[in-house]
Amino acid sequence: MKSNDNEKDQISKPKILTLTNGPYYLINNMKAKIVDNLQNSKGEPLSTISGIALCRCGASKHKPFCDGTHSIIGFSSVNKTLNDNNKAFRENRRDYMGKEITIHDNRKICSHAAECVKDLPSVFKLGNKPWIDPNGAETEQIINTVQKCPSGALSFSIDGVEYRNPSEQRNPMVTVSKNGPFCITGGIELIGENIRFGDGASLEHYALCRCGASNNKPFCDGEHGRINFRDEQ
């Protein structure tokens, strides 16, 4: 019975497919549905899995939806941080050990939303070296701030046990951030070629590039800020 329930969950749970040199394809349900007014030569109704194409080249005139512009501008979905063997050139994960908590940070997958800096500047000190002070606030405050990180670049450990995901389970959701990436929460599965989550990354939440300029595609690396990407969604 449990296996059947698991199968149903996998079918009903949304997924995001990254199409090579093309858009993201958000599939809300993996169960094929009959297409109205369409049949095969035997008169049998045809079924398909339906989804929504989301722009990731940054040039669609109908953001966040894809309008085919990626093929006109020659968009490339190549991840420039991988070598010929699809292995990361380098990982930038660092550990900042405090008295009660250790904060882990991977710069490679940071979307530069600056939630941590704005929320807890006594711990996350942009421009300082080291830029993280794990003793700069109460442990509970640090946990709350780390769990707000949209990209999954931040995580924490207490007594040698690492925590990468929020304490409460969240419903699957894709949020279009203003002038920024797609923020994914709730453990939506990401499928496609050459997908490499960074060291220590969360599978529950991550940020996907939609400006087209990230070097770490499909993940956001903050390039939308450098190129002044604009979308008021």
Predicted features and spans:
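Short helix-coil boundary/hinge micro-motifs
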Residues: 4-29, 166-168, 173-176, 186-187
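Ferredoxin-like iron-sulfur electron-transfer modules
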Residues: 20, 42-56, 91-112, 124-144, ...
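Short recognition patches in nucleic-acid-associated and regulatory proteins
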Residues: 31-37, 122-133, 189-193
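A structural feature that tracks compact, well-ordered secondary-structure segments
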Residues: 53-57, 64-69, 118-123, 134, ...
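Hydrophobic, ordered structural segments
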Residues: 55-56, 60-63, 73-80
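Iron-sulfur cluster-binding cysteine motifs and their immediate structural context
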Residues: 63-73, 111-129, 146-160, 217-228
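Short cysteine/histidine-rich metal-coordination sites, predominantly Zn2+-binding motifs
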Residues: 70-88, 125-138, 162-170, 224-233
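Surface-exposed interaction/gating patches
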Residues: 99-113, 172-195
